[in-house]
């Protein structure tokens, strides 16, 4: 199986295609893909990455996956699987890396100024990535992630308000929740010195799976 390794603002991604997975002898369904993602993303025994991204044509439909949004207007489809096997809707850094890989595989359109547009169907909707090429074969990739969502039922958040209280780091705090493709829980601190880096991962995991978030959430301390 041929797998590319990409990095965007510190997040790293392993990227391949449905065809590569099938040609390696696997049946493409959600259970198989989760197992493959866990193995590939493992930093000790696999390639090592934050996520596995998988490319397919815009007629993609496979067992166990949710319906993609914007698929009819897209050039291709992006499957996104976290290292732990969970399936988020979107990754801002991932979508740009994915679009670069997709263009290398022949997807997208090029205008008269050599700028490239790749339309990608995701679980969070159609995302359009534009690469503006500059000198020395460098390019700047940008994507419109759409407006942030604050309505609790759309985030989704089990609350009447996207401003919620949370007891964290021995203090009750006012925090804020939004969705920019995936849910984000923003928790203000008086100082970043409040964070114990040794226990940060454990704290983040506990908050990520808070029962108020039916689809889990990213956790951001500011």
Predicted segments with their positions:
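Internal active-site segments that recognize and position negatively charged phosphoryl groups
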Residues: 164-196
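Glycine-rich beta-alpha junction loops
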Residues: 59, 147-149, 180-184
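A glycine-rich beta-to-alpha transition motif near the start of alpha/beta enzyme domains, typified by
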Residues: 1-137, 185-222
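Active-site glycine-rich loop that binds ribose-phosphate moieties when present
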Residues: 149-173
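Membrane helix-loop-helix hairpins that form the core translocation module of multi-pass transporters
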Residues: 140-148
């Amino acid at each position: 199986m041929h797998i590319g390794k990409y990095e965007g603002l510190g997040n790293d991604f392993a990227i391949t295609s449905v065809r590569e997975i099938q040609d390696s002898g696997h049946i493409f369904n959600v259970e198989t893909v989760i197992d493959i993602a866990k193995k590939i993303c493992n930093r000790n025994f696999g390639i090592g990455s934050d996520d596995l991204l998988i490319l397919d044509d815009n007629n993609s439909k496979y067992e166990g996956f949710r319906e993609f949004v914007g698929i009819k207007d897209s050039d291709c489809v992006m499957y996104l699987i976290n290292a732990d096997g969970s399936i988020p809707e979107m990754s801002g850094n991932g979508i740009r890396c994915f679009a670069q890989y997709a263009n290398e595989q022949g997807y997208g359109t090029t205008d008269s100024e050599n700028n490239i547009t790749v339309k990608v169907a995701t679980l969070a909707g159609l995302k359009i990535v534009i690469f503006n090429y500059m000198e020395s074969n460098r390019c700047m990739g940008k994507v419109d992630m759409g407006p942030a969502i604050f309505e609790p039922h759309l985030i989704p958040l089990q609350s009447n308000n996207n401003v919620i209280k949370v007891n964290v780091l021995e203090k009750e705090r006012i925090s804020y929740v939004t969705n920019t493709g995936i849910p984000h829980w923003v928790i203000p601190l008086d100082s970043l010195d409040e964070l114990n880096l040794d226990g940060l991962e454990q704290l983040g995991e506990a908050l990520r799976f808070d029962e108020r978030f039916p689809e889990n959430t990213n956790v951001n301390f500011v």
